[in-house]
Amino acid sequence: MAREVPIEKLRNIGIVAHIDAGKTTTTERIPTTGKDIQIGEVTEGAATMDWMPQEKERGITITAATTACYWTRNGERYQINIIDTPGHVDFSVEVVRSMKVLDGIVFIFSAVEGVQPQSEANWRWADRFKVPRIAFINKMDRLGADFYRVFKEIEEKLTIKPVAIQIPLGAEDQFEGVIDLMEMKAIRWLEVTLGAKYEVIDIPPGYQEKAQEWREKMIETIVETDDELMEKYLEAQEITLEELRKALRKATINRQLVPVLCGSAFKNKGVQPLLDAVIVTYPLPIDLPPVKGTNPNTGEEEERRPLDEEPFCAYAFKVMADPYAGQLTYIRVFSGTLKAGSYVYNATRDEKQRAGRLLLMHANSREEIQQVSAGEICAVVGLDAATGDTLCDEKHPIILEKLEFPDPVISMAIEPKTKKDQEKLSQVLNLSSLKEDPTFRATTDPETGQILIHGMGELHLEIMVDRMRREYGIEVNVGKPQVAYKETIRKKAIGEGKFIKQTGGRGQYGHAIIEIEPLPRGKGFEFIDDIHGGVIPKEFIPSVEKGVKEAMQNGILAGYPVVDVRVRLFDGSYHEVDSSDIAFQVAGSLAFKDAAKKADPVLLEPIMEVEVETPEDYVGDVIGDLNSRRGTIMGMENKGNITVVKAHVPLAEMFGYATTLRSLTQGRGTFIMRFSHYDEVPQHIAEKIIGERMAGKSS
């Protein structure tokens, strides 16, 4: 079956920004041809890209909604697959897992607030995934909008080379359109059409000098990336528009430059040129290097080129529960084709699975298709897959690199209200924790039997509980949020574990001696087999490691997991008859417990990176409050009459901070908080936490 859209007419893009910079509104404004789509307003709770009830109520994006739309440029029809991602830090996993499947990203910046914290964090992720970018300075119609200030912030804060290919025609309530520095024409949107139509005019006299100045800057910046053009430029030869565009595209794909455009998505101004820039400057799927993975049968590295004739290979980047279709698995096809109803091989799980219906998505509406090909994105009904799984041709197996997600930093106890709720809850938590959201986990406390849910922040858990009620009709009682403490050690120690059990028949014998030492913070766990002379047979070495890991999960001081430890197994003994896997597991566990209590164990707590934006009048009160929360002020930055206070604060001290900040700043302050690192809890506080924890376990 021939593909509907040629691969060279396909673009896969993400829309990423800080919360409230206008991502969803921008996506809503991207028009489609052949479909009558009603434009929704985020401010009215009607945006179609924000389709979950919680998103409509809060005016923020929680999940990464996908939409396929079409754009015609110079008579050629293109398909643009767009992923609109959350700006709230509690849902940044949606941004990260989208990065792997995108060919380019449009970063939205507010012309008023400029470069904000979550944008910086997401920019670093884009660097890691080597994704080309375009910057769109939005909200040019707002009071305080300043294109030139934000352009400078992009250059300084993100340490990249931006190149303005437009400058604004007016600002704030005088914002009319943009000046195209390539064509040296002004584009003015007609208010009477609500921005649906525009006119191309000569640059007004009052803007000609600034336009010429910025065009020169644009040309200089672009030619610096191309030796041939630089030579022509230095020799004062004419550089054609086609040469400039070609060089800009190459520099964008190679991540040497970031084109900068501007507009007001809310007023529907600037979106059409943004789409043109996506078509002209972003890479085609066939421009990208082959994806690399591992053949599970041979262990050797293999690659797949973005061609339909290559063996099928796709990456599951998102899994969602749909109330009507069941599980939806969103995939990006890197090579080959997949037909509806055919079988695929889930190489990650070593399972053959049937792909039912294939759906082209527009937020929460959908269009059924019969085939998906290289470079395309779709949702598949019927697969039992999880985020990060590789789907492929069974005869040509490959496993692509899986994403690593941060551990949750906050937990909360939940209790079903009725027996009926109890029965449904385990099924829902299994889907949410294992497949749908890799940063959300559900566990059962082995001592109390309580169900604990774990996530990236208060809002994250609040949304999950709300979804249980709305989508599955499950009512739960919710406990207070709890901090995900951890434990570690400060010094080296040696420990011995010996497990001997004599019964009437065969006994049990395991004996292990280990040395433990602290690792740098965040390094996790290392196990070194340093056994010589066969004092412990090789088949029992993994048993010792398993026992050590089990003991680490149960903690030293208060039952919290132990992290950042190196364990060296260097001695022990065994019995020809009585030694067994379980005996050496117990020996390993006992050895770790023996060593750990001598290694100066300490309690660790999550430290959050907090950024508070407040009017100048309240800075003193804000800093005083952060200090009272054991915070360390890391710096301050002025943005007009707004001051940004940056601090490191223990998560345990940040519960309920939103209410306090509203009170301190008369509702005018805002803050963002994200995980930074783990650090030691001060001794007097640690003693209290340990005491309360142990009292809870004994009661």
From Swiss-Prot:
GO terms for biological process: ribosome disassembly. GTP binds at residues 17-24, 84-88, 138-141. Its main location: cytoplasm. One of its GO terms (cellular component) is cytoplasm. It is found in: Cytoplasm. Keywords: Cytoplasm, Elongation factor, GTP-binding, Nucleotide-binding, Protein biosynthesis. Catalyzes the GTP-dependent ribosomal translocation step during translation elongation. During this step, the ribosome changes from the pre-translocational (PRE) to the post-translocational (POST) state as the newly formed A-site-bound peptidyl-tRNA and P-site-bound deacylated tRNA move to the P and E sites, respectively. Catalyzes the coordinated movement of the two tRNA molecules, the mRNA and conformational changes in the ribosome. This is Elongation factor G. It comes from Aquifex pyrophilus. The gene is fusA.
